[in-house]
Amino acid sequence: MAAPWVSLRLVAPMWNGTRGIHRLGGAVVPEGNQKKERKMLQFLNNHFYDVEALRGYLLQREMSKVHLKNRSFTWLEEQHGPYSAGAFFILKQGGAVKFRDKEWIRPDKYGHFSPEFWNFREVPVEAVDASDCEINYEGLDNLLLLKELQSLSLQRCPHVDDWCLSRLYPLADSLQELSLAGCPRVSERGLACLHHLQNLRRLDISDLPAVSNPGLTQILVEEMLPNCQVVGVDWAEGLKLGPEERPQDTASPVPA
């Protein structure tokens, strides 16, 4: 942000022999007011600088936290196998996992969860609910360990973007259900990357603000994945003509 000195349009002071500042308009600013102006300008300058510095610091701190949450758990994979390592990553993010023939495992409101999943070293994870989690591109390394994953929910994940979707192809043989509802950074380009997932049976693409034409996008996705039920979008959404695009009837009215 530019310092407020310019916006106030100060001009160079000129001395006219009196105590004060003589401006170009001819008015003399008393010395007391001059000091007040300088203090105010200094305060504004310091204030704006501090806000920018604080904003940058908070942003950097938040990104560091996201990076830490998405670090690789290779050491866990080596000790406990890919299923337990992948499950631990999701549970630490606040998500839930379901091992084959087991009940869902979810963290409580304090983030604590049962350690029993460490005993499921040889049991595949068949479903993951990562809704509202801070998974990003790097964190997918831990999720892609789950080669038998059948159901994946990434609803409202703020860091899931088009690049993330381009990495899901290793799950093509197993993944049958995928929800991307409410992901703010997913656009048509990312959805086009899902053509690898030909075993999908259900895909939720509702509430994607980065998709410019939801109706047309759903039609194209349905053609790309003919065996998949695409839900969440009214097929006519984005295809209806607005008032300014509708043809005007210029014919003369028929007399009664």
Swiss-Prot record:
InterPro entries: LRR_dom_sf (IPR032675). Its main location: mitochondrion. The modification Phosphoserine is found at residue 252. Keywords: Mitochondrion, Phosphoprotein. SUPFAM superfamilies: RNI-like. It is found in: Mitochondrion. GO terms for biological process: mitochondrial respiratory chain complex I assembly. The keyword Mitochondrion applies. The keyword Phosphoprotein applies. GO terms for cellular component: mitochondrion. Belongs to the ATP synthase subunit s family. Required for the assembly of the mitochondrial NADH:ubiquinone oxidoreductase complex (complex I). Involved in the assembly of the distal region of complex I. Interacts with incompletely assembled mitochondrial NADH:ubiquinone oxidoreductase complex (complex I). This is Distal membrane-arm assembly complex protein 2. It comes from Macaca fascicularis.
